[in-house]
Structure formats: C-alpha cells, structure tokens
Amino acid sequence: MDGGLCFDSWSDYLGLSSLISRGLQPRGEGENPSPRWNVSCPAPAEPLPSKEPEGRGYKGCGFCRSNKEAMSLYSSHRLRSLDGRVLCPVLRGYTCPLCGANGDWAHTMRYCPLRQLLRNPQSPRNGQ
C-alpha cells in the first residue's frame, strides 16, 4: 500500500501536541499569566447565581461541589460573580493547559473556549 496516500491515525496532522506542550511549559518570573491566544471567553457555563446567595435553591460553588469538596467549603463561596468573574479560590488557582487562562477567567479544559473553537470551527462556507 502507498505510504503517502493512507491516513495515519497516529500522525499529528494539526500539530496539536506541540500546541499543548507549549501551554504546559512553566512561565518565567514576571511573565504575564494571561492567555496566549486572543480568544474571548464565552458566557459562564453555569447560570449566574442570584444576588442573594442564601436564597432559595442556592447550593454553593458548583465547581467545588462537583469535585466532592466538604460542604463547609463549597457553601462558603459562589463559583462566579454577577459579572462572570471566577470567585472560587480553587478554580482561580487553576491554569488551563490549553490557553493559559487563570484567575478571573479560569476554567477547566472542558470549558476552554479554545477547545470549543477547535471542536466547532466556524469557517465560511462556499466563500461566503
């Protein structure tokens, strides 16, 4: 069989391994920890909490709760502020290995806007 005409499932055609490796490299001192790509963050994955955190239905931080943290921890804070910034101290300390986001705009790989763009590229069709 012709080696040049076959699809090799083990080949990294898009160069994603080097992209991820660059995202996993430690940053130097004084280097800005902001994302390396110009990707705007989408709306929060979870609905924003009401202004009254103790209101009916409030269950605390969804991130900590889903990671099975103690109730005393997850009920002590909200995941996001009303303007969408991350409040959870655990998530704020996490850095996305794909885009480098952390702090106010921290997210896990599952909610990374870069991952979502790679999964659903919105390229123009038929030259439009």
Swiss-Prot record:
Write out the GO cellular component annotations: cytoplasm; germ plasm; perinuclear region of cytoplasm
Q: Name one Pfam family in it.
A: zf-nanos
What organism is the protein native to? Xenopus borealis (Kenyan clawed frog)
How are the domains described in the entry?
The Nanos-type zinc finger is composed of two C2HC motifs, each motif binding one molecule of zinc. It is essential for the translation repression activity of the protein.
Looking up PANTHER family in the UniProt record yields:
NANOS PROTEIN
Protein task? Acts as a translational repressor. Can mediate repression affecting different steps in the translation process: cap-driven, IRES-driven, polyadenylated RNAs or nonpolyadenylated RNAs. Essential for the development of primordial germ cells (PGCs) by ensuring their proper migration and survival.
- Residue numbers binding Zn(2+) 2: 96, 99, 107, 112
Q: Where is this motif: C2HC 1?
A: 61-88
| Keyword Transmembrane helix carried by entry | no
State the similarity comment: Belongs to the nanos family.
Q: Which region ranges are annotated with the description Essential for its translational repressor activity?
A: 7-23
Q: Which cysteine pairs are covalently linked by disulfides here?
A: none
Q: What is the protein's given name?
A: Nanos homolog 1
Residue ranges for motif C2HC 2? Answer: 96-112
InterPro entries, A to Z: Nanos/Xcar2, Nanos_sf, Znf_nanos-typ
Q: Where in the cell is it found?
A: Cytoplasm; Cytoplasm, Perinuclear region
Q: Where is this region: Disordered?
A: 23-56
Select a single GO molecular function from the record's annotations and give it. RNA binding
